[in-house]
Amino acid sequence: PETLNWIDTFKKNSIFWDIGANIGLYSCYAASRANCQVYAFEPSVFNLELLVKNININSLSEKIKIIPFPLCEKLSFNSFNLSNKEWGGAMSNFGTNKDHENLQDLFKYNFNYNTFGLSIDESVKLLNFPKPNYIKIDVDGIEHLILKSLHTKFLIANLS
């Protein structure tokens, strides 16, 4: 409920980056409720199917862009590790399986594949994505690496 309440405060027609979009609950809510342009970052092949379905069921394909790769600290090609193969599943990460505080394994993974990832700044600079006004990050333990990549002052100044 806290995240939905937060989305209710968004200014109309804002840019919302949903990093770790899963099946698109917050993406769809922001696109329909606040008329946001949404960039839904979701690298799990299992979650992508439901994300696409939810966007189409809600007639939001013009408002939500799907980015099927992970955000990370810097441009890299690495292993995307998943703890399960369930649709709507969680507990996955990119490039590492260690938590940032005590360097313990985050979880046991049983499925992985290699893909590329890039930083928030690189997404704006290299791919011309619009600067976000709002960012939600829910990526099971590598939030610190994604935030570490947020160097550009003009990008930070755009956030609400």
Where are these regions (language model features)?
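Phosphate/nucleotide-binding beta-alpha loop and adjacent structural elements of enzyme active sites
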Residues: P1-S160
